[in-house]
Amino acid sequence: MKEIVIWPAYFDLKRTKNEGRKVPKSFGVLNPKLKDIVSIIEKMGHEYSIDNKKSYPKEPWEICGYLKVTIDEKTSKLDFLKELCKRMK
């Protein structure tokens, strides 16, 4: 198992790749919220921890929080993010 960090900015349709979006626009969602991501990860059955008091490094003035999620070694971070996006829509 490996641990990955997930920021809501990774899914934000309004952001460019340079601004931190990690998934293709076709997978993106508008204004992703940490609580929505948490509920999906809970349904998927993954272990996670939340840090609500951190700001995304590209926007240090905005506190949005992040998740640390435990996933299978064989699963890539991008594949996991895409699966989350499918479930968010």
UniProtKB/Swiss-Prot annotation:
InterPro entries: Signal_recog_particle_SRP19 (IPR002778), SRP19-like_sf (IPR036521), SRP19_arc-type (IPR022938). Keywords: Cytoplasm, Ribonucleoprotein, RNA-binding, Signal recognition particle. Its main location: cytoplasm. The keyword Repeat does not apply. Pfam families: SRP19. The keyword RNA-binding applies. It is found in: Cytoplasm. One of its GO terms (biological process) is SRP-dependent cotranslational protein targeting to membrane, signal sequence recognition. PANTHER family: SIGNAL RECOGNITION PARTICLE 19 KD PROTEIN (PTHR17453), SIGNAL RECOGNITION PARTICLE 19 KDA PROTEIN (PTHR17453:SF0). Belongs to the SRP19 family. Part of the signal recognition particle protein translocation system, which is composed of SRP and FtsY. Archaeal SRP consists of a 7S RNA molecule of 300 nucleotides and two protein subunits: SRP54 and SRP19. Involved in targeting and insertion of nascent membrane proteins into the cytoplasmic membrane. Binds directly to 7S RNA and mediates binding of the 54 kDa subunit of the SRP. This is Signal recognition particle 19 kDa protein. It comes from Methanococcus vannielii (strain ATCC 35089 / DSM 1224 / JCM 13029 / OCM 148 / SB). The gene is srp19.
